[in-house]
Amino acid sequence: MSNIFSEYRSTPRVKFIPTMLMVAIVAACTAPISKTGRRSETFDAVAATQTFASGFRHISERYIEPVSASELALEGLRGLTTIDPSLQIQHSGNRITIGSDILSPHSYTLPATNDYEGWANLTVQILLDAQNQAAHYQKTKLDKLYEAVFDGSLSHLDAFSRYASVEQAKRNREKRSGFGGIGIRFIMLENGASVSLVFPGSPASNAGLRPKDIITHADGRSLVELKRQETGSLLRGKIGSIVEVKVLRPPARIPFNLSIKRDRIVEITATHSVKNGVVNIHVTRFNNHTAQHVAQNLAQALQEVHRQLNGKAKGVILDLRSNPGGLLKQAVNVSDLFLVNGRIISTRGRHPASNHDYDAKSTDIARGLPLVVLINGRSASASEIVAAALQDHDRAVVIGSTSFGKGTVQTVITLPNKAEITLTWSRFQAPSGYFLHGLGVSPSICATRDKNSDAANVIETALWKAVQHTETVQAWHSVSTKQKRERQRLKEICPATNQLNPIDVKIAERLLKDTALYQRVKALNQAIAFIGK
C-alpha cells in the first residue's frame, strides 16, 4: 500500500558529551586498526554520532506512539545481529554487556532514558570497539552499520516506518519528484514490449509511437525475454537524455528506429467510460495530477453524454477499487471536487505539526448528480479518505467491500548522512469522527457475500438489513484504536475482497438509473450523519 507522507529535513542538534567519551570519539575519527593490523573503512565518529542522535531524537519526538531513546538505541543494537548473528546483549540495571563469537564481552554504562546524544555516543562507541576487535566489523560498510541499527530501532514500531540507505533515499527522492521516461504503458510479448497506451503529449506521442507498436530494442539491447521491470528500467532515465528504440509496427515486418528524448512523466491516474448515461471514472492512484485528471475526465464524459443522449447524465461512478492511495493533498482535492463545504479529513498525532484539518472549499463539479463510490480490500490510504469524506457528508453511496484500513500518515526525515527515515506520525480521522487505521471504510451496500447474486437482490438485502447496518455504523464509530481484535471483527462483517467484482458496477448502474431506489439506499448514510452530530 502506498504511503501518504510529508517531508521533513532534520537539522543536526548534537551536544557533545563528557570528556572521557569525547577523547574516545576524537581518537576514533581515524580508521580503527584491528589486532591483525588491517585498517577498516574510515569511520567518522562525529558524523555517526550526529546521525544516530538525529534519528533517535526525531523518532522519539515524532512517532505516533511514545517511544524513548533508550528503547530505540537498545533495539538498534539488537539489530546488529543481522551483521553478527551470535551477538548477545545482556541488560541489567544501568549497564549492558555485549559479546559474541567474535567479540569479547564488554560492559557499558547506560545514559538517561531520553538522552539522545548519550545513546548516540554509546552506539558509536560500541561500533568502534567492535571494529577494533573483529575484522568482520571492519569489513562491514558504514551504510550497512547504519541500516542494521536503524532497522532494529524501527522494527518494533509499525509496518510503515522504515530506514532507507543513502542510495535508496536518493531513488526515493527521484520517485517522489517524478522520473524521466517516454510516457507509455506496455505488456511484454515474445518479440518485445507491446505498447498498450501512449500518454497524450508525452515524448512517445511526440515521436510518433502508437498503441500496438512493438519495441524490440532499447539502446541496442534486445527486449526479448526481458521481464517487464527490466524493460521499464531501460526506457527510463535522466530527464533530457535520449533513448534509441527499434520499433516494429504490425503488419510490417521491418522495424524502424526512433530517437525519443526522455521527459518528466506523470502517470495518467484517471480514465472514464460512458454507458447509457452513466459516467464511470476509474482512478488508479493519487499522484500530483490526479484531481486534475478526474476533473478533466468528468468534463469530457458529461460532454459525451450530452452528445449521445442530448440530455443530462444519470449519475457518476467513482471507481476506487484496488487503488493503493498516494498523496494526501490529492485525496483532499478529489474529495473537494464533489463537496461544497465541510470537513474532508483530519490528521491526529503526538507532534503538534502532525495535526491538520482539511475542509472543502470548492464547488461540486458534478452539479449534484447522484454519485456512487466503489471500494474493495485493496482500496487504501488516499482512496479511503475520499470514500469516507463522500460517505460521511451523504454525498455518495459506497458499494463493494470493507477497504484496506491504511489510515496513517508518514513523515520523511532526512538524516545528516543523507539517508532517510519514513516515520508514521499521525492517523486519519474521518469527518464523522472514527479513525480509519486498521478498520477502513464500511460500504453501505456490501457485495462481498452476494457476488454471485444479481444486483437487485443485493440492493434489497442491504435495505432489509438497515437496522443491522445502523448497529455496524455505531460500532464502527465507538471502537477504540487500541481494540485491534474488535476492529478486525468489524471488518469481517463485510469481508475485504481483492477482486474487481463485476456486480459492484451492476449495482451502481442500477441505482443511478432509478432515482427513487438511489435515495432509499442513500438514506442508509443517515446513521453516520446522526453519529457525526
Sequence positions of predicted segments:
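Structured segments of extracytoplasmic/periplasmic soluble domains
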Residues: 58-66, 75, 79-86, 125-137, ...
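N-terminal secretory signal peptides that target proteins for export/translocation
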Residues: 1-12
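PDZ-domain C-terminal substructure recognizer with occasional recognition of PDZ-binding tails
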Residues: 191-194, 216, 230-271, 424-425
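PDZ domains, with a preference for the canonical peptide-binding region formed by the helix
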Residues: 205, 211-246, 330, 406-412
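PDZ/PDZ-like domain segments forming the peptide/carboxylate-binding groove
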Residues: 45, 62, 96, 108-121, ...
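Terminal targeting/pro-maturation regions of precursor/exported proteins
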Residues: 12-161, 477-533
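C-terminal "post-core" interaction segments
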Residues: 5, 30-36, 42-56, 266-533
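Short flexible coil/turn linkers enriched for glycine and charged/polar residues
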Residues: 176-180, 188-192, 209-210, 237-241, ...
